[in-house]
């Protein structure tokens, strides 16, 4: 696959209405639907076929599933029946309670729900077996188109379904989300906050309940009023505890939805209550304030009605907030915008987005524990210029998300352990070196490195310039990431890898023969013996000359220069264009080669005859090539071996091609030093010659 440059520059916050359709046909939902209506056919989605490939990638169904359209399951199917509510969500035979908890939370915010579940579809007029749903993914909204064939067994939906068997919006939403992530199996296991963010483009904040602030009830209450999506769960100590039921009816390792908070009068006291929903649609808390507990007998009937108290086993229940804090461990809040939950006033936050990659051998440096490679990670400069209203510092929230890991599960990819550190920026600009991190500690960091899709943290720092370094915990781990910076006042962010600066010295003029050094005279004799009277060598002859000379350099450990390197050298130095190298051209190159050899020996730290690819950035800069992260990634992919090492031949080949490309660009960019204009013939000619 050809390389496509992915910019790390800040991206604008996307407009939710501008969703991009990702169907392989290139057509929008409406175009596809109209095509089906005109042809009188029901839509069949070739991108997500009604077969096992869309169900599982590592197993097979234990019973034969039959894909059926809603009209083949019930007589009168409805898309949404009586409004989309949290009771429309009942878990099936798939371990995606985290997704169902997020959908239940989504139903509490009508505006967000309408965006994810467009209302321009149904089983009435205009029905063509096609539906669409919108999800946020890494800075943009995607419109996911599906057909309405659903997996069934004995005419019952196998996976997510509504309590009313005629209603299908929730089952179709689950299918669209499965398509987005590659299969239904990809939805097994997760955190509710992941789907909440995909439903809103919001930003997550996580609370360990035992460490929560004193006003935690008010924080949650305010979050619900602002339309935030809330989930909660109970931790497990080991895998055997997953979905184990406690004596009070709670399920460990299971995702619940927080659907309400309130207070009631009880024996002259105001009791704080929290309403929680189990996406199974059954199995509830059976302690104080549960559906049939005696506490409700002391509550006025009007008050019970206001709270929606029922004794149905529908998976939703009230419990005292003090009991909630004892029995639950974690609360996840997805803020539609990261409004400060501790303040009563709403704020409009500024948002910048950076897309980047950790690439093994060049930008996958790991955390600060790995000093030798940590500095090679992407570095984002953050300039905080304005203090918050009435505050001494500047508030911002940094959210680091690893991309597409769920979609890549079928290929063995798991969530990586990620986090970030923030440093005071020194006066000088440019990518910070290893020595900086050797002598400077971070000012702030994510609380922990953790294997979640996103790590987010709120900070308040004095005005100034800072460097934020996102990384995996271990080095050499590859992933794409999305970094979002939310700030109360305008903040300027810039990627430090973007600056490319190439400093090429002027080519020296030929030295008169009578002024040649003893070494040059020896070269002339060897050159003349190989080249003959015309004093020009071919690539094969140059290979012989250079290897004969370099084999005598005992400090330089390498097998031999390749013919490819010699061809590239001639391409760089051949001014006549005859494919051969004259002696004067060779002498100029020899001066370069001596300098490049000295650099190689300097960065061959263990004197093994190879250089670590992580040292390449510094070595190239010393040779006059300050390159951005994406170029370094390309170079490492091309020249480093599987152990992330470059031998001298690879190193030399890289430098020769870099200088050749740079000099060609300089010769063509006469009017504008940043751009050149080429037609297809010129472009291909150049690429074949570099």
UniProtKB/Swiss-Prot annotation:
Chain segments carrying region Domain III: 338-521
Binding site for Ca(2+) 2: 284, 291, 312, 314, 316
This protein's UniProt keywords: Calcium, Cytoplasm, Hydrolase, Metal-binding, Protease, Repeat, Thiol protease
Binding sites annotated in the UniProt record for Ca(2+) 4: 604, 606, 608, 610, 615
Top EC class, one word: hydrolase
Start and end residues of each stretch annotated as Disordered: 1-23
Superkingdom of source: Eukaryota
GO cellular component: cytoplasm
Residue numbers annotated as active site: 97, 254, 278
Signal peptide: none
Annotated stretches, region: Domain IV: 522-690
UniProt keyword Manganese present: no
Compartment(s) where it occurs, according to its Swiss-Prot or TrEMBL record: Cytoplasm
SMART domains listed in its UniProt record: calpain_III, CysPc, EFh
Molecular function, one GO term: calcium-dependent cysteine-type endopeptidase activity
Tissue specificity note: Predominantly expressed in stomach and small intestine, although low levels of expression in other organs.
Binding-site residues, Ca(2+) 1: 81, 83, 88, 167
InterPro entries named among the record's database cross-references: C2_III, Calpain_cysteine_protease, Calpain_domain_III, Calpain_III, Calpain_III_sf, EF-hand-dom_pair, EF_Hand_1_Ca_BS, EF_hand_dom
Domain EF-hand residue range list: 518-552, 561-589, 591-626
CDD domains associated with the record: Calpain_III, CysPc
Family named by the database record: Belongs to the peptidase C2 family.
Name recorded for this polypeptide: Calpain-9
Organism: Mus musculus
